[in-house]
Amino acid sequence: MFKWYVVQVFTAQEKKVKKSLEDFKEASGMSDFIQQIILPSENVMEVKKGEHKIVEKYIWPGYLLVKMHLTDESWSYVKKTQGVVEFLGGGAPVALSEEEVKNILADLEEKKSGVVQKHKFEVGSQVKINDGVFVNFVGVVSEVFHDKGRLSVMVSIFGRETRVDDLEFWQVEEVVPGQESE
């Protein structure tokens, strides 16, 4: 019976491992045991220096989903593939439940159908400036221009609120509440 398993692979080698598993399953006679291999990813819109670029980002870096009939032979084949660390569950791989699979596949389908904005800055959120004249200043977002990948931030300079305009998304990072002093 085919079930879904989560396979841990070396980070940054997800595509390579997926391709290896797919390419060699035919040659090694594993196509009867391995049905499908998914690298969970989504399309993300990044804006750098005013240019919009859609890039593929892995939702679970270092993991693949493999739909397979688990036998000693198929387990060994996957485990011995270069770049594979282990099955989740360790020595005894644990299959995902039907409910987990349904939720994961629905989530992946939803994420693949659109493009996610990488930066979700909102007016009123706190950010730290990482580049430019005001580097290391912490301020509050006053305007967001998602179409241009830019925002404006209000910072306090000598006790006076000053607006810093035309910052690109990559020049700032969100500040987690309670960690402003880092």
UniProtKB/Swiss-Prot annotation:
Family matches, as SUPFAM superfamilies: N-utilization substance G protein NusG, N-terminal domain (SSF82679), Translation proteins SH3-like domain (SSF50104)
Domain of life where this protein originates: Bacteria
Biological-process GO terms, alphabetical: DNA-templated transcription termination; regulation of DNA-templated transcription elongation; transcription antitermination; transcription elongation-coupled chromatin remodeling
Coiled-coil residues: none
InterPro entries found in the cross-reference section: KOW, NGN, NGN-like_dom, NGN_dom_sf, NusG-like, Rib_uL2_dom2, Transcrpt_antiterm_NusG, Translation_prot_SH3-like_sf
Entry keyword annotation includes Chloroplast: no
One GO cellular component term noted in the UniProt record for this chain: cytosol
Any Pfam family: NusG
Keywords: Transcription, Transcription antitermination, Transcription regulation, Transcription termination
Matching HAMAP family: NusG (MF_00948)
Role played: Participates in transcription elongation, termination and antitermination.
Protein family: Belongs to the NusG family.
Protein name: Transcription termination/antitermination protein NusG
Species of provenance: Chlamydia trachomatis serovar D (strain ATCC VR-885 / DSM 19411 / UW-3/Cx)
